[in-house]
């Protein structure tokens, strides 16, 4: 079984009720943090997960709302890990990830220096290993396998989606993307597809062109549902709601998805949990 927890279902727009985009995936005793939106560590704490307990951080792309708390994750995983010789935190993402991590650590350079000077058991900067991929297998440990494929979030590029597999169960995390053949292939037959969604029918009515522009590179609810249908997934899990879902609107969003997808449809608030079993 794979357990998916929507840690943050928000967007770049600050929302008092929704943290930034982030999803927790637990499989075979391993814990993966997919994207690092604002507030992610507080949401993770609510389900008993700390930064030092992460098996890896998986980044779909490098938009600010998806990496806003990456620096905090890197530092907190270091200062809260009390092992004598802690293993490096694994960070997996598209090309550009290593540069981004380096910049984050540089921004926290003074803090790192302060902590090394203060604590006798901290004698080196945070141990981080970064791996950049656009395609193929990126993880294969103790029965958990992860592979990636390109998605289409242009002009943001490159971007990737992740497929996590364990004991016959599978979950795909699409990140930000419009429909594309590579995502269809990655998601084919998966137990669940976690997909960012927007309401283009609402957004196109905004007067600001900058707001309308987000329709260029995000999937609408119906488009995400159509991707799920083409790929033959069991469950569509919607997240990254733009605009934010107002209480009482959930059935409306589900109905839009149901016009294109006949399977199980999941959406909800932060900390919404979905179990994915072998198919």
From Swiss-Prot:
InterPro entries: AtsA-like_MBL-fold, Metallo-B-lactamas, RibonucZ/Hydroxyglut_hydro, RNase_Z/BN. Gene3D superfamilies: Ribonuclease Z/Hydroxyacylglutathione hydrolase-like (3.60.15.10). Its EC number is 3.1.26.11. Zn(2+) 2 binds at residues 65-66, 240. Pfam families: Lactamase_B_2 (PF12706). It catalyses: Endonucleolytic cleavage of RNA, removing extra 3' nucleotides from tRNA precursor, generating 3' termini of tRNAs. A 3'-hydroxy group is left at the tRNA terminus and a 5'-phosphoryl group is left at the trailer molecule. Binds 2 Zn(2+) ions. One of its GO terms (molecular function) is metal ion binding. It comes from the Bacteria. Keywords: Endonuclease, Hydrolase, Metal-binding, Nuclease, tRNA processing, Zinc. Its cofactor is Zn(2+). Zinc phosphodiesterase, which displays some tRNA 3'-processing endonuclease activity. Probably involved in tRNA maturation, by removing a 3'-trailer from precursor tRNA. Homodimer. Belongs to the RNase Z family. This is Ribonuclease Z.
